[in-house]
C-alpha cells in the first residue's frame, strides 16, 4: 500500500502532456483529499475503485510513463491488458469496467469474479480517472434542488428543512447544494468520518450525535429563514423513524446512501460500522438480506414523510428498486430526480462539463472562471453558480471546476481553455471531462433514463454509441462501465476526457469531442420524441436522418 498524492508542477514524467494528464488524474482520484478509502484504491460509492489492485495500479503507472504519443493502452476492469500502435489523434487510453453479459449482470456474479481478482467496480468516475471530489456532483445537486424549489417553494428553499442520508463522495454534495439554495438540511450518516470530511471541506456546517439537537438547530434556522447544514451521526432508519414519531415537519426527503451496493455500501439498522464490517466478511448473504430489509424500512419511512406532505424523490441510488424487490409494492410512488427535475436540461445537451488544472495552481482555475464569465455573460444561472462556487467550494486534490454547459457551449469553452494554455495565461494543460451522469451517455431505467417518453428506458445502445463516437472524435481517454450509481444490472454508461494542451491538434480534438458528446444527448432525447430536443437539433443543425434529414416522416 502506498500513499498517493495529486502531482503538481510543470515537470512531467511521461513522454507527453496527454499521457501525463492521465497519470495525474489517476493520482488525483486517490489523493487523500479526494478518495474515500485510498488505501484500498476506493475512490467513492461503496467500492468504486481506480485500479483492480496495487499490482495493476503500478502496471498502469509504468505503462503510462512509457506510452508513446501514437499508442493506446487498453484497461479491462482496472488492469492494463494491452498497448497497441494507433495514431496521435486516437485516445491514449480506452477503459472498460465491470461490464458483464446481461444474464450474469448481478452482484453475486460480480462478487465471485471480484474475489478471484478478475473484475473491479469502477462506479462512474472512479475507474475512469476523472473524479474531482464532491464538487463534481455539487452543481448538479444544486440545479436539482433549485428546480425543486421552483416547482414547490416559489424558487427558494428558505424556511424549509430537507432530510437526507449518505454523506460520502456523492451524497456529500447535498448539504452545500441545499444551503446554496437557502434551505436547512439534516444529513444522516452512520460513518462519522464522512461527516468530518464534509465539514473540513466546508460542505457541511455542523455535526452532532444528538437527534434532538439536530432538530432544534434545524427548527431555529427554518424559523429565521436562514441556510444551515447539519451532519447527524446515526443510522437513517433509526433517525427517520424517530423524527416521524416526534411529529417534526420535514419539507423535502431524499437519500444518497450507497444503497446501490447492499453488501459493501449500506449499513443495516442495528449495526455499528465495526459490527457491519465483521458480519459482511463472516456471512455476506445474511448481511445482504439485512441490508435489503433495512432499505425497505428506509423507503417506507420516506413514503410516510411524503404522506405527511414532504416532497420526496429518489436521488439515483436505486433504493426504491431494492425496497420493491424486498416486497414493498409502492416503492416507486415517489419519482427519480432526473424525470422530476433534470430531463429538460438533458434535452438541450446540458450536463456536467468539468475541468481540472494539471499545474495544481488555483490561479489557473481563477483565470478559467474569468473566461467563462466573458464567454457566457447572459447565462444568469451559470454566473450565480460561479459566484457561489468561488465563495463556498474548497478544492479537493487538483484545483477544478464544474459548470453545466450545453451543446455548442462546451466546445466553445474547451477551445477557449486551449487558447489560454497556448497563450500562457494558464500555466499548464487542462483536462476536460464529465461525470457519466450526462444527457446522452447513460442507460439507467431507475435514474437517468427513467420514464422516457417513448418507453426506451432500458435501451443500452445509446451509451455504447456515445463511447464509440467520442473515441472516433479523438478523446484522450474514453471509458465504458456497467453498474455505476444504481448497481449491477441496472445501468450502462460512458465517460470521456480530452486534454487541452494548447496545440492545434488539441483544437481539432476538442472541437470534435465537445460537439459529439453533448450532441449525443440531444440526439438521444430527440429520438425519444422530446420536442425541446428536436427543436435544438433543428436550430443547431444536428443531422438526425429520420428527424432533421431526408428521412423525415
Swiss-Prot record:
Relay the cofactor remark from the entry: Binds 1 NAD(+) per subunit.
EC number, as in UniProt: 4.2.1.49
User: Subcellular location, in the record's words?
Assistant: Cytoplasm
| Pfam families (alphabetical) | Urocanase, Urocanase_C, Urocanase_N
Question: Which GO BP terms apply?
Answer: L-histidine catabolic process to glutamate and formamide; L-histidine catabolic process to glutamate and formate
Quickly give the catalysed reaction: 4-imidazolone-5-propanoate = trans-urocanate + H2O
Q: Which PROSITE patterns match?
A: UROCANASE
Pathway(s) annotated for this protein in UniProt: Amino-acid degradation; L-histidine degradation into L-glutamate; N-formimidoyl-L-glutamate from L-histidine: step 2/3
**Which residues does the annotation say bind NAD(+)?**
45-46, 123, 169-171, 189, 194, 235-236, 256-260, 266-267, 315, 485
> Which cofactors does this gene product need?
NAD(+)
State any single GO MF term.
Answer: urocanate hydratase activity
Its biological purpose is as follows: Catalyzes the conversion of urocanate to 4-imidazolone-5-propionate.
Q: What is this protein called?
A: Urocanate hydratase
Species source reads Staphylococcus saprophyticus subsp. saprophyticus (strain ATCC 15305 / DSM 20229 / NCIMB 8711 / NCTC 7292 / S-41)
Amino acid at each position: 500500500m502506498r500513499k498517493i498524492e495529486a502531482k503538481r508542477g510543470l515537470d512531467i514524467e511521461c513522454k507527453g502532456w496527454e499521457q501525463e494528464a492521465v497519470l495525474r488524474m489517476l493520482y488525483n482520484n486517490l489523493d487523500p483529499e479526494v478518495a474515500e478509502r485510498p488505501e484500498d484504491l476506493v475512490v467513492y460509492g461503496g467500492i468504486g475503485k481506480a485500479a483492480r489492485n496495487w499490482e495493476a495500479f503500478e502496471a498502469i503507472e509504468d505503462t503510462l510513463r512509457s506510452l508513446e504519443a501514437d499508442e493506446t493502452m487498453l484497461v479491462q476492469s482496472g488492469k492494463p491488458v494491452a498497448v497497441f500502435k494507433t495514431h496521435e489523434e486516437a485516445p491514449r487510453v480506452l477503459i472498460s469496467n465491470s461490464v458483464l453479459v446481461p444474464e450474469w449482470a448481478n452482484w453475486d456474479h460480480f462478487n465471485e469474479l471480484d474475489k478471484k481478482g478478475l473484475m473491479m467496480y469502477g462506479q462512474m468516475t472512479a475507474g475512469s480517472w476523472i473524479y474531482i471530489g464532491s464538487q463534481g456532483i455539487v452543481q448538479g445537486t444544486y440545479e436539482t434542488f433549485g428546480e425543486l424549489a421552483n416547482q414547490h417553494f416559489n424558487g427558494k428553499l428558505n424556511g424549509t428543512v430537507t432530510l437526507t442520508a449518505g454523506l460520502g463522495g456523492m451524497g456529500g454534495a447535498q448539504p452545500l447544494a441545499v444551503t446554496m439554495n437557502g434551505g436547512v438540511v439534516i444529513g444522516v450518516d452512520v460513518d462519522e468520518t464522512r461527516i468530518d470530511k464534509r465539514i473540513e471541506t466546508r460542505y457541511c456546517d455542523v455535526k452532532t450525535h444528538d437527534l434532538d439537537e439536530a432538530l432544534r438547530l434545524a427548527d431555529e434556522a427554518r424559523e429565521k429563514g436562514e441556510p444551515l447544514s447539519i451532519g447527524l451521526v446515526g443510522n437513517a432508519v433509526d433517525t427517520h423513524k424517530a423524527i416521524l414519531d416526534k411529529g417534526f415537519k420535514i419539507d423535502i426527503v431524499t437519500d444518497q446512501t450507497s444503497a446501490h451496493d447492499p453488501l459493501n455500501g449500506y449499513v443495516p439498522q442495528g449495526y455499528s460500522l465495526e459490527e457491519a464490517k465483521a458480519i459482511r466478511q463472516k456471512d455476506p448473504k445474511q448481511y445482504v438480506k439485512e441490508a435489503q430489509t433495512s432499505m425497505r424500512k428506509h423507503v417506507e419511512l420516506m413514503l410516510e414523510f411524503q404522506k405527511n406532505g414532504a416532497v420526496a424523490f429518489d436521488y439515483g441510488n436505486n433504493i426504491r428498486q431494492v425496497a420493491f424487490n424486498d416486497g414493498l409494492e409502492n416503492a416507486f410512488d415517489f419519482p427519480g430526480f432526473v424525470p422530476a427535475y433534470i430531463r429538460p436540461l438533458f434535452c438541450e445537451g446540458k450536463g456536467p462539463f468539468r475541468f481540472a488544472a494539471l499545474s495544481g495552481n488555483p490561479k489557473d482555475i481563477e483565470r478559467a472562471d474569468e473566461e467563462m464569465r466573458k464567454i457566457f455573460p447572459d447565462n444568469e444561472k451559470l454566473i450565480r453558480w460561479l459566484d457561489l462556487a468561488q465563495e463556498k467550494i474548497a478544492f479537493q486534490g487538483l484545483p477544478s471546476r464544474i459548470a453545466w454547459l450545453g451543446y455548442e457551449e462546451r466546445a466553445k469553452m474547451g477551445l477557449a481553455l486551449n487558447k489560454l494554455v497556448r497563450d500562457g495565461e494558464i500555466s499548464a494543460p487542462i483536462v476536460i471531462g464529465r461525470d457519466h451522469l450526462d444527457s446522452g451517455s447513460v442507460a439507467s431505467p431507475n435514474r437517468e433514463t427513467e420514464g422516457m417518453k417513448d418507453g426506451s428506458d432500458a435501451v443500452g445502445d445509446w451509451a455504447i454509441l456515445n463511447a464509440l463516437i467520442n473515441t472516433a472524435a479523438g478523446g484522450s481517454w474514453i471509458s465504458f462501465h456497467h453498474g455505476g450509481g444504481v448497481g449491477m444490472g441496472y445501468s450502462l454508461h460512458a465517460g470521456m476526457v480530452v486534454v487541452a494542451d494548447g496545440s492545434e491538434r488539441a483544437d481539432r480534438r476538442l472541437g470534435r469531442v465537445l460537439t459529439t458528446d453533448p450532441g449525443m444527448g440531444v440526439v438521444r432525447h430527440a429520438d425519444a420524441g422530446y420536442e425541446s430536443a428536436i427543436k435544438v437539433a433543428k436550430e443547431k443543425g444536428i443531422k438526425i436522418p429520420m428527424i432533421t434529414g431526408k428521412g423525415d416522416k
